């Protein structure tokens, strides 16, 4: 496993055949079977839930990052939050929608990302990230800001490469 994970290494390739956490940062799966949505509306959350159900991933907990979670919780606490049956509203004012996946191996992550790209989100795809040991105890606010900044930087780089 990668014990020497570099904080500056923002993007790592996902090994489709690996049975480990993406980026090989943990042996096996890391974290609960969950997806944290940041910046999604309740309607969009329902669309994502239907998409996961259609993929046979109805066992994955789908969590919406609320303002309280954003301001007070770590990534770990957010991923362990139970919201069944609650109509929750996401953090307002987010420039970039973010999908943070937990408990998945490479092929599963790729399947989720592909499903988003084939859905109504294809023209405004969110930023995708995976929960890894390096960010597990960080405040979710810090993690979201880092992901959002990295995503904006990557989009600028992609735009200038064309």
Task: Report residues per predicted region.
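A cross-kingdom feature marking solvent-exposed beta-strand/loop segments within repeated
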Residues: 54, 60, 65-86, 115, ...
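Short, flexible, solvent-exposed loop/turn segments with mixed acidic/basic and small polar residues
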Residues: 20-29, 86-92, 117-120
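Short, solvent-exposed interaction modules
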Residues: 83-115
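Helix-rich interaction surfaces within compact, conserved domain-sized segments
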Residues: 46, 104-160
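N-terminal, charge-rich interaction modules
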Residues: 2-80
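Glycine-rich, often proline-containing surface loops adjacent to acidic residues and nearby aromatics
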Residues: 30-35, 92-98, 124
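Short acidic DE-rich linear segments
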Residues: 1-6, 154-162
């Amino acid at each position: 496993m990668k014990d020497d994970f570099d904080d500056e290494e923002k993007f790592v390739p996902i090994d489709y055949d690996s049975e480990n956490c993406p980026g090989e940062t943990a042996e096996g799966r890391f974290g609960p079977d969950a997806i944290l949505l940041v910046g999604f509306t309740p309607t969009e959350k329902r669309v994502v839930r239907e998409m996961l159900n259609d993929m046979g991933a109805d066992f994955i907990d789908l969590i919406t990052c609320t303002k309280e979670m954003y301001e007070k919780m770590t990534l770990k606490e957010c991923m362990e939050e139970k919201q069944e049956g609650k109509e929750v509203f996401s953090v307002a004012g987010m420039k970039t929608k973010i999908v943070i996946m937990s408990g998945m191996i490479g092929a599963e992550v790729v399947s989720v990302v592909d499903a988003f790209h084939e859905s109504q989100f294809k023209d405004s795809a969110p930023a995708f990230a995976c929960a890894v040991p390096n960010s597990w105890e960080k405040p979710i606010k810090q993690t979201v800001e880092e992901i959002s900044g990295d995503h904006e930087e990557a989009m600028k780089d992609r735009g200038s490469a064309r």
